[in-house]
Amino acid sequence: MSLLRRWFDPIRSSWFYQKPVRQEVLPTDQGLTIYLRLDDVYSYLAAQQLPQLEEILTDEMKPLKVVISNQTASPPNEMSALEWQQYCLNDAKILSKQHRFSFHETPEQPNAEALQQAETILRHTPLRGQDFLYLMEDVFHMLWQKQYGKLRTLHAMASRHHQVQNFPERVFNQTPVLSAYFEFADRKYQAVDDLLRLARRLEQQKLLTDNPIFLINHIEWREHLISDAEELNEIQALDPELDLYIALEDPISWLLLAYIKEELADYYNIQLNIYPLSYHGRDQFDWSLATRLSKRSEVKFTPFCRPTAAASLAMAELFYSVPAEQQLEAMYEILRQVWTKGKDPSFKTHFDQLRRDLNIEQLTEQDISLRLQQNDMYCEMKSQPSLPVLELRIAEQSYVFNSLYRVWMIESIFSNVLEELYKSENESENEQRKT
């Protein structure tokens, strides 16, 4: 690692962390825009929130501008179009259950004819403002709830009785849209994952007239979903196990591991297994995003010295040089030193200090590069669009998800497991009474 990076990164990161996370006021002259695709399942979820959002926007922010694209962007993480499509359907199904969105039990992508009919309806309608948003929500329901008969009827009426409308707040184009997102003051907010962040921003700038209540079962950082002692004992007795696939140069890996270890692992009796990955170039990250996540999750995150490929390899060497039962604590300490002390493991002095701190007498003789490649292969088999990748095993079931945005799923899954367990016990008792 260059001397400039080794010395300048900790200074720069400390300065950046001490700055206010939010710019006090963002310009409102461009209003608020949402980008959708009719064949995007996240757009379907987002459409169910838009009438309420429009209702509580101040007059300054109305009307909400809607851009409907018929062009998708390339899937992330080298996923195929089919893999991405299946991931989105599964993920949206989980989100819909967690946040009480309307959703079909067996969702399918709408067919081309239905999509064209839906676009025609929305292009032709003279409705505007909240009325248009309610219509758009209904059209999305017809597409994704397989209500093709209703869609054909509405399409026939729109085609016969109305002409194409041209309103400035309603745009149809071919802007590549991977999944639904809002745009405010040139900043992008993912339509589901960042909805609460957007609402906080709008509320901060007094651009809402009422309290925003969108994701009703959202789990805040460090607020446990399960607090009843009996329920907690039930989960702990199931011995949950969690695998983490992490890129060592990615600060999100530190934030996620630290949060889970400090807040969830002991509380729920989770066995954590760490699988470091080879260098993925994730040291070029969004500093403001990582800073914001650090403050939201209450995990320390400065000063740091971004690891290079050589530093990541050195971190993995230290990790695999400790006994298996000590590896979790070792990885926590390695990442803590890198992301809160500014240590550079590719620098011999720092490497030797880390080695002493971890009480490593003999470095491993394993081929570290080969070991990381094996972890890469197992991680790729999970077919996830982002890192870190998590696999939770409990009650003979396995659940795979990804990123810091989905950490809430751990507790949500526990809650669902308990619900199924109690349901099964009640059914068993009822059967015994009958006999």
Kindly give the residue locations of the regions a language model identified.
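Alpha-helical context
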Residues: R22, L26-Q30, I68, T72, ...
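Residue-level preference for long, well-ordered alpha-helices that form the structural scaffold
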Residues: A81-W84, C88, R160, E249, ...
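Alpha-helical membrane-targeting segments
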Residues: M1-V25
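Short hydrophobic/aromatic-rich motifs at helix boundaries and adjacent loops
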Residues: V21-Q23, M61-V66, E169-V171, E231-N233, ...
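Structural alpha/beta surface segment adjacent to cysteine/selenocysteine redox centers
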Residues: L38, Y42-M142, W254-K341, L421-Y422, ...
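C-terminal cap of thioredoxin/glutaredoxin-like
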Residues: L3-L4, I11-R12, T28-L32, S43-E55, ...
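Aromatic-flanked redox-active Cys/Sec active sites in thiol-based oxidoreductases
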Residues: Y35-D40, Y245-D250
